[in-house]
């Protein structure tokens, strides 16, 4: 199946001034309304990582769950859930981070990873990189390492991919948008 970049980007809806004035939110829900596009996204990630040497897939709450869980299933890898504060029932590790909207906390079960594990982190989008950096810090606190940070969309003008790369975390995104791109 050929990956059609222009059709793919047309399925990501810009929502102006959401969730606050001045923000252009990239809504991926239309992408999931197209089984063909969803399959192309999943297949692209599966093909990229089918031979890669890593042990776990970490998914960010909540839109990272949509793609990362299917990729984990396809690659037969354990899934690690990184949740918003207060959503996990057992002992957790917590990490504060800044989003483009304000401060938040990311949590993971403290027994999710072991020393020597290697994690591919999935989110829907890289903006400031705050969520993925917080997840990387949690991964490292458990003695594991980050293989790569992955998203459907990169917003390079917000600097997240650069921040991740500066922290020696490679990134991979299927597409990118300029902030003013409609």
Curated annotation (Swiss-Prot):
Domain of life: Bacteria
Annotated GO CC locations: cytosol
Metabolic or biological pathway: Purine metabolism; AMP biosynthesis via salvage pathway; AMP from adenine: step 1/1
Reaction(s) catalysed (UniProt annotation): AMP + diphosphate = 5-phospho-alpha-D-ribose 1-diphosphate + adenine
Intracellular or extracellular location(s): Cytoplasm
InterPro entries the UniProt entry points to: Ade_phspho_trans, Adenine_PRTase, PRibTrfase_dom, PRTase-like
EC code: 2.4.2.7
Entry-linked CDD domains: PRTases_typeI (cd06223)
GO MF annotations in UniProt: adenine phosphoribosyltransferase activity
Pfam families referenced in this protein's UniProt entry, alphabetically: Pribosyltran
UniProt keyword annotations, A-Z: Cytoplasm, Glycosyltransferase, Purine salvage, Transferase
Main location, first listed in the record: cytoplasm
Any Gene Ontology biological process: adenine salvage
Oligomeric and partner information: Homodimer.
Function of the molecule: Catalyzes a salvage reaction resulting in the formation of AMP, that is energically less costly than de novo synthesis.
Family designation: Belongs to the purine/pyrimidine phosphoribosyltransferase family.
HAMAP family: Aden_phosphoribosyltr (MF_00004)
Protein's recorded name: Adenine phosphoribosyltransferase
Species of provenance: Pseudomonas savastanoi pv. phaseolicola (strain 1448A / Race 6) (Pseudomonas syringae pv. phaseolicola (strain 1448A / Race 6))
Gene: apt
């Amino acid at each position: 199946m050929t990956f059609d970049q222009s059709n793919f980007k047309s399925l990501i809806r810009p929502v102006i001034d959401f969730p606050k004035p001045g923000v252009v939110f990239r809504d991926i829900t239309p992408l999931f309304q197209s089984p063909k596009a969803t399959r192309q996204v999943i297949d692209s990630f599966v093909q990229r990582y089918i031979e890669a040497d890593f042990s776990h897939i970490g998914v960010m709450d909540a839109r990272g769950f949509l793609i990362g869980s299917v990729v984990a299933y396809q690659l037969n890898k354990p899934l690690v859930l990184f949740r918003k504060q207060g959503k996990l029932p057992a002992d957790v590790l917590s990490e504060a981070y800044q989003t483009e909207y304000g401060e938040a906390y990311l949590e993971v079960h403290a027994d999710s990873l072991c020393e020597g594990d290697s994690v591919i982190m999935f989110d829907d989008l890289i903006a400031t990189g705050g969520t993925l950096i917080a997840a990387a810090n949690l991964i490292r606190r458990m003695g594991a390492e980050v293989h790569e940070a992955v998203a459907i969309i990169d917003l390079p003008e917000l600097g997240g991919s650069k921040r991740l790369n500066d922290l020696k975390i490679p990134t991979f995104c299927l597409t990118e948008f300029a902030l003013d791109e409609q």
